[in-house]
Design a protein with these regions (language model features):
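N-terminal capping segment at the start of a domain
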Residues: 8-24
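Cofactor-binding active-site loop characterized by glycine-rich and histidine/acidic residues
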Residues: 15-18, 30-135
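Conserved small/polar residues in nucleotide/adenosyl-binding loops
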Residues: 136-143
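Non-catalytic, mobile gating and regulatory segments of ester bond hydrolases
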Residues: 1-4
Length: 146
């Protein structure tokens, strides 16, 4: 098993643990895009170890469909942006790891609040006017009028 395959396995384990511990969340979408997120964050994206909201000299990532936050949080933790142990606080009161990522929580790696499907597309297009950026979204934005 390669390092990437081991990481995919661990991220999937994190997702199941987070969702099961709270009896709440969207495991299907998160589990379905785990390989994409792991390869993107650990093999493709140009990113720095320490998160910088401005994203100078690195690729930008925006998550539009925030309901897949378990995979996003797990990958951010595994990338070293915050302690892996914090994953156990997913969807708990006063946790930075809510059902949809938000910027006011100050969580490293989160550039935009997500929730309204398609919102990330507009943000990513705006950022792309000045630099290279990456966006992952569900097919739903086409149906949301964005």
């Amino acid at each position: 098993m390669t390092g990437i395959q081991k990481l995919v396995f661990q991220v999937r384990r994190d997702i199941v643990r987070m969702v099961h511990a709270n009896n709440s969340g969207h495991p299907g979408g998160s589990l379905g895009c785990t390989e994409f997120f792991v390869v993107l964050f650990f093999d493709i994206m140009k990113r720095k170890k320490k998160f910088n909201m401005n994203g100078y000299d690195e690729d930008l990532f925006f998550l539009s469909n925030g309901h897949i936050s378990p995979v996003f949080y797990s990958v951010l933790a595994r990338a070293g942006y915050f302690p892996v142990e914090e994953l156990s606080t997913f969807r708990k009161i006063n946790s930075r790891l809510q059902g949809h990522p938000t910027t006011h929580e100050g969580l490293p790696g989160v550039r935009i609040a997500s929730g309204s499907l398609g919102q990330g597309l507009s943000v990513a297009i705006g950022a792309a006017l000045s630099k290279n950026c990456l966006l992952y979204t569900s097919p739903s934005p086409r149906d949301s009028g964005k």
